[in-house]
Each structure stands twice: as structure tokens, then as C-alpha cells.
Amino acid sequence: MIKYLGSKRLLIPSILETIKTVPNIRTVSDVFSGTSRVGHALKKSKFRVLSNDYCEFACTLARCYVEADDTLTADAEKIIRELNGLQGSAGYFTETFCEKSHFFQAKNGERIDAIREEIEKKSLDEPLRSVLLTSLMEAADRVDSTCGIQMAYVKSWSKRSHNPLQLRVPHLLARSPHGSSKAYCMDANAFVMSNEFQGVDAVYLDPPYNQHSYLGNYHIWETLVKWDKPEHYGKACKRTECKVKKSKFNSKREYFETFKALISNIDTKLIIVSFNNEGYLKPDQIVDVLRTKGDVCIRQTPYKRYVGAQLGQYNPRGERVSEVSHLDNIEYTFYVSSDPSVVSALNKD
């Protein structure tokens, strides 16, 4: 899966274990799906999964790893063999992300251009189209020249950027015995109030924590998926949409009320919330909101900050303008249930 700030790889075993302790959980919703690492793990554990994300690239990943079933693997393998045989042809991607900026070597940018144009020409149905786009995203991610996010590229080419671009077939899973999984691209608060959210037994929430927009952090993937060849700005060649498409979860002023509204519209057997010590809300504020839905258990997981945050900030001349404040973060996981026995069992662990 793609490199992603805030990946929940370390939390997945605990999340799965907890959900399995609650009786009659069949459908689980991942409301801020990101890379779909959590959604993929849930589907692998036989749950029916409803994924959602505000960004189109994240929804594409969810269509691949959550919505698509393994019955599509043979078709994907055939087309990916064909795409891997294409010669490069410079276009928008090469010009924007290899020449005007240096996120990728030109030889790989040219192949990305050629492969993406070929996918577009095929006019494939979903979710097969998203399986191929995910394969391309992940191939590009393996040869980029960043510290993990697309706010900037490194001054000297990364070692991996010299490798040739090669598509791989994503690992698709069997359909859940509880029904087909589905991916949506909606505002989170609108999603939990929609008909699509009906029948959800448990929900996992991993909202943005602060002002940093995932659209801005991963704008290249959004452009690659939409293939709208947008106008852009700055050294990172961000799509201009980044200036106007904002989530209320990126606003300190609006965050608390938006989070409170989100929780108020969820009525499931279990709610799981991830949050970070660098976020706008303090743990006690989150607990106060969650207690309206039942008893709350909190767990903490320490982890290293992403590599870019460990370097400090530098001006255009390469001079350090700020020191690193801390190297470690804490991930809080809140478990909420109206069934006291569920939270009681968690508190004994």
C-alpha cells in the first residue's frame, strides 16, 4: 500500500480483536478510509465493510481493497501485463511532476503518462478500473523522491527513484459472507446521515487531527486518479483545488462542533476513534463527546513521528529556521459501547 502519514498498521490487531468480542457484528464502516489498510484488514476478517473518504484517490484505494473481490484478479493480471509492456510517452504528468517539480525521474513519469492514458482509453467498469489505478499509484509510490508526503520533494534524488516503474497486482480479497462491501466518496458527516450508512453494526473513525489536509499532502495521487490535468501552483505543483476544498476537520474553530455532530449521528453497537496528541482536541474533550454514546475505554500507542517532522523546518536557502520539538507521538484509541460488559472487558486487558 502507499506510504501514508497516520497509517494505522500498528493499531489493526487491537481494533480487530475488539470488534470480534462484540456479538453479532457483521457490517463495519471505515468513515475516513485513507489507504484502506483498516478496511482491507476488516474484510480479510470476513466483515462486510463500508468505506468512505473525502478524497477521490482514497476512494479509489477503497474500491480496490474493500469493494473489489478476488474474482477480478484474473482480469487485473491480464491488463497489468499489457500495461507493464507499454513504452513511455511524456505528457502532463512528466511535465508537471518530473520537469517543473522533481517528484519522479522523467523515465518513470513518461511511463506513468502512457499507462494512465491507456487506462483512460479502456473505459473500464468499477471496481476493476480502481484496481488498475491502485496498481499504478502504488508503482509510482515505490519510485518517488519524497519523505512520504507530497508537500515537497527531496533535494537529491532518492535511491528508489532510479528504479524502473513496475505495476503489481493488488491483493484482492474474497467477498464477505455477510454481503458485498462498498466504497463511497462523501463528506464524513453527510455519509453517516445517508441511506448508505444504514445497517452498520460498528464504526471506525480516524478523522484528520489538525490543519494539514490529506488532499494537499497527497495531491499527486488525486491528480493521477482524476486525470483532469489541473492548473497548479507552487514548487510542489499542487492542484489549485487544494486552496478551496477544505474539510471542517482541518479548521480549529470548527473542529469540535463538527466532531460532536458526527458522533451524534452514529448509533452503532461499537464506535472506535483514533486520535493523535498533535490534534486540535484533547483526550478529555473527546471522551466528553463519546460518553453521550456509552462507556469509554482509552488505549495509548507510542510511535515515531514521520521522517519529515524529525528534520525541523528550513528556509529556501537551506538554513534551519526551527528546531524539532519532539520525536515521538501518542496515538489514542477510544472504544465506545452502550453495552457496559464490552468496555468492562476492554478495561481488564
What do the PLM-derived regions correspond to, one by one?
Residues S33, E95-N217, K229-K245:
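SAM-dependent nucleic-acid methyltransferase catalytic core
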Residues V49-D53:
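Conserved SAM-binding motif I beta-strand of class I
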Residues F57, A62-A114:
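Conserved phosphoryl-transfer catalytic core
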